[in-house]
A protein has these predicted regions:
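Conserved donor-binding/catalytic core segment of Leloir-type glycosyltransferases
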Residues: 4, 173-190, 196-199, 211-213
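Extended catalytic core of nucleotide-activated donor transferases of GT-like folds
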Residues: 4, 48-147, 249, 432-436, ...
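Acidic anion/phosphate-binding donor-loop and adjacent secondary structure
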Residues: 123-124, 162-178
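Nucleotide-activated donor-binding/catalytic signature segment of Leloir-type glycosyltransferases, i.e.
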Residues: 223-248
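Short hydrophobic beta-strand element within catalytic cores of glycosyltransferases
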Residues: 282-285, 300-303
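A charged, aromatic-enriched C-terminal amphipathic alpha-helix characteristic of glycosyltransferases
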Residues: 323-331, 340-371
């Protein structure tokens, strides 16, 4: 059996890192190929030859004859599109929300890999997930939330998030400033505004303290971080903005800060917090949701005051259920404690970081993922043979289209002539109605089986 992985492989968000980490790791244990749904103009900076071996296709929204349609394209480095017989593959779909990939009609075994930040899945999406053979989640908390909503416990597996190998402690650069570091997309869930307000109030009369932030948010509309701070009267010489830093810059800031700061209302995992712990950085966190899977044994936790609705109209955060409201008065106390007793907390975190790293390496968690899949389906290995290669007949990518079905699928043999008169051939599970809608009389298809 092969594993066809569907997810957001390209990009710089936490979930892009999550997807790449798992798919890269899984490829060491099983034959996989990947369908990606994100775009990143800077992907050449991190996509390597191993990635190119497993990245098979990408789903993009295209405008064809004034109609917005979802199209699948081969990647530019592929001379052939790779697939396997539909009876020999398992589908693994991972996305950070109720993404359209979850609604596709997959032939054969299918596994959902979901990460949720509130305590309640969207009911319609949950009904879709119930049709999957199993659902992999990151934490016990997420599993408990699913069970409370009536999800079959026997269909839930837990696989933890991984840590990038570039996360480890260093000898820090000397500085005359005590540096806090706050990371996360500005918004309601991450409680960025409230956290900055608390910091400024706490250290109003202490001069040797800085708060470094990387909190840019391009949605729903782009507002520069400096402008957001001005809107809420939070501009201060104590705040140092780092806008969309490259990975090496981000790590240099993280590894040289004194205390990492996070006080969010809901986390599926909290990758920045995990990376800070791996680097031996004393870390402040809110004591709720998914991050407790790995952070609860650390001392700088902030209590939860109450549950509040997750839905937040102003911030366009449309989650169901509830999230945790941190006690921001207690956050002020923890901030001061971490500042005054820094050497004690630094020693504790340095003592713990090597064990933490070994527990969450990508190699380990990817092996856990493989074991979970193999236990349910078996017959998965690196030695599987049988890739079917669908050759392209032109180097020009324009005009090569295929699409997967939301509804009734069939195996087809398709010939497509584009506007230049070029003829293309390909095979895949596609929805004939969608293809005919996109290409009209240009399409000739023969159904092989349903």
């Amino acid at each position: 059996m092969f594993i066809k992985c569907h997810g957001s492989y390209l990009g710089f968000t936490g979930f892009n890192n999550h997807t790449r980490g798992f798919f890269r790791g899984l490829s060491k244990y099983a034959k996989i190929y990947v369908r990606n749904f994100t775009v990143d103009g800077n992907s050449s900076s991190y996509i390597n030859d191993e990635d190119k071996q497993i990245l098979s296709e990408q789903t993009l929204w295209s405008n064809y004859k004034n109609t917005s349609v979802r199209m699948d394209y081969p990647f530019e480095w592929n001379q052939e599109y790779l697939d396997v017989d539909i009876n020999e593959r398992i589908h693994l779909i991972t996305a950070e929300n109720s993404h359209h990939y979850f609604y596709d009609n997959y032939y054969g075994p299918k596994i959902a890999f979901t990460m949720w930040e509130s305590d309640t899945y969207n009911p319609d999406f949950l009904n879709i997930l119930k049709n999957y053979d199993s659902n992999i989640v990151l934490t016990k908390w997420q599993k408990e939330c699913l069970i409370k909503q009536g999800f079959d416990e026997s269909k839930i597996d837990i696989v933890h998030e991984g840590i990038e190998p570039d996360c480890f402690p260093i000898e820090q650069e000397k500085s005359n400033k005590f540096k806090f570091f706050l990371v996360g997309k500005w918004g309601f869930r991450k409680a960025i505004k409230e956290t900055i307000e608390c910091f400024l109030k706490t250290f109003e009369h202490i001069d040797d303290v800085e708060l470094h932030i990387t909190v840019d948010n391009a949605h729903p509309i782009w507002i520069p971080t400096e402008e957001r701070l001005r809107m809420y009267n939070l501009l201060s010489p104590k705040i140092i903005i780092h806008s969309f830093p490259d990975r090496d810059v981000y790590l240099r800031i993280l590894k040289n800060c004194n205390v990492f700061l996070s006080c969010s209302r809901g986390e599926g995992w909290n990758i920045p917090l995990a990376e800070a712990l791996a680097c031996g950085i004393p870390s402040i966190y809110s004591k709720g949701s998914g991050q407790l899977e790995f952070a609860s044994e650390y001392p700088l936790g902030v209590d939860i005051l109450k549950k509040i609705p997750a839905y937040h109209e102003e911030d366009k955060y449309f989650a169901d259920g509830y999230v945790d409201e941190p006690n921001f008065e207690m956050l002020s106390e923890v901030l001061l404690d971490s500042y005054k007793n820094y050497s004690t907390y630094k020693k504790i975190h340095l003592q713990k970081c090597q064990h933490f790293i070994s527990k969450y390496t990508w190699n380990k968690v990817s092996k856990d993922l493989f074991d979970v899949i193999n236990k349910r389906y078996g017959s998965i290995s690196l030695n599987n043979q049988g890739y079917i290669k669908f050759h392209r007949f032109s180097e020009d990518l324009n005009g090569i289209f295929f699409s997967q079905s939301y509804f009734d699928s069939c195996k087809v043999y398709i010939e497509i002539t584009n506007e230049n008169g070029d003829l293309y051939f390909f095979n895949d599970l596609i929805m004939m109605k969608n293809v005919e809608h996109c290409f009209g009389s240009e399409v000739q298809g023969k159904k092989i089986f349903t």
